[in-house]
Amino acid sequence: DIETGNPNTIGEFPQQENLEERKVVFNPHQEKGKVDEIKDNFIALSQMPDYKNKPEYIDEDTRDEFCTSNKLRFLRKYQHEAVLKIQEGIEEGTERFLLEMATGTGKTLTSSAIIKMFLRNYGVKRVLFLVDRLELETQAQKEFNEVLKNDYTTVIWKENEKNWNNAQIVVSTVQSFISNNKYKRIFKPSDFDLVISDEAHRSLGRKSRRVFEYFVGFKLGLTATPKDYLKSINVAGLTEKDPRELERRMMLDTYTTFGCKSGEPTFRYSLLDGVKDGYLINPFVYDARTDITTELLSETGYIFEDTDEDGNDIEETFTKKDFEKKFFSEETNRKFCETFLSNARKDPYTGEIGKSLIFCVSQKHATKITQILNEYALELYPNKYQSDFAVQVTSSVMGSQQMTIDFANNTLNGFSTSNEYYRTSKTRICVTVGMMTTGYDCTDLLNIAMMRPIYSPSDFIQMKGRGTRKKDFRMDWIDKTQLNE
């Protein structure tokens, strides 16, 4: 890039049309007017421009309750710093940015502030927010509307294919754009002046990167997976098809794509930062692996030695691929469930097993684990749960998507009857395989059980991240006057 002096890696050779349109339309160094001074109330001003004049806000005794009841969102210090880092980069001529922020630290709220900043100050007319899962489309639109609806319109592209261009923020799965090359057939390179990729290193595969590079303008990547997460792994010993090697290459490619070849993102806020600042909870790990499962998942596998009926020595090696088929016996599954129930954290106000997620190897395995847990619940808590103690939430179960919403809202199969003044879900455990990972927001989860091997670092971080958010359980009291009783 001889004009801006800020070269970037591209996924394919650009067409003449793209280059000409970029020259005419996208000029990050154009003369700018007065730029907003971004403060921590940048989003709150969109939600309620005159909030400072409200008597309930002026009165310090009622201010917190006023902000909470009106759901006013103020940027935390690190979120504010992330926005300012982007602003600094723009002033220096940077066009690509990468935010590395731990799960639960508010990447979407930070993105909302960044989107507002771009739309107000830097000639950006429309923003494309790319996700890689259907449920994240709806969630992103909901979160953007909660804080920006007074200023900007947010739509999901596949629901507004005819009038999407009336909106300032368009949310879509990258798969929708890839299908039949829709991104080329329907859109011009200049239709989006800012493209944001959520969980960038996972969503920007080879094909999806073409979508990302097709549009001219600013580019922002979001990720919760730090690049150095695999630094302790012997890279030389990994095969090309090893999930860790594939993920390592994706991470490196992602940092390069966003101009971070040094390995340093535009802004970083880790899990440890969040714990230190009091925003996140560091998980307590209970390791329930046996010697056999540890060997089974090792590079060499588990070597089984015995003798047959004729007295001949038998030696057989079992590896990762045998984990489910040959080692998930009834006895093993029961041991898993017993260990979980013995160590699971309890709800602070009902004493029940805290709300939990269990990740299984397959849908068949999830069915079995659910069945065993409900059998134990019947023994331990007769007539309390009616087989609703644990529920299978997988793609094969009708209404599973709604189940995830009900569980987060504490309404799955009704309410717990343990405390009439306190609201929590009757169902205590959701048993799943791949659902309820990325982007699933359920702050009162107390236990995450991984009853399967997990080879992808980003999957592990996302699963673990479901349980790192802080929760004030007092907020779930229907009648808070009963709290001290």
Regions found by a protein language model. Give the residues of each.
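ATP-dependent helicase/translocase motor core
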Residues: 1-126, 135, 139-150, 165-169, ...
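Conserved C-terminal RecA-like helicase domain
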Residues: 168, 316-432
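SF2 helicase catalytic motif II
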Residues: 185-221, 225-228
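Interdomain helical connector at the RecA1-RecA2 junction of SF1/SF2 helicase-like NTPases
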Residues: 235-354
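Conserved RecA-like P-loop NTPase helicase motor core
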Residues: 194, 391-485
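Conserved RecA-like ASCE P-loop NTPase motor core of nucleic-acid helicases/translocases
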Residues: 99, 124-133, 354-362
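Conserved helicase motor
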Residues: 134, 155-163, 173-179, 205, ...
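Conserved helix-turn-beta segment of the N-terminal RecA-like "Helicase ATP-binding" lobe
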Residues: 134-158, 372-381
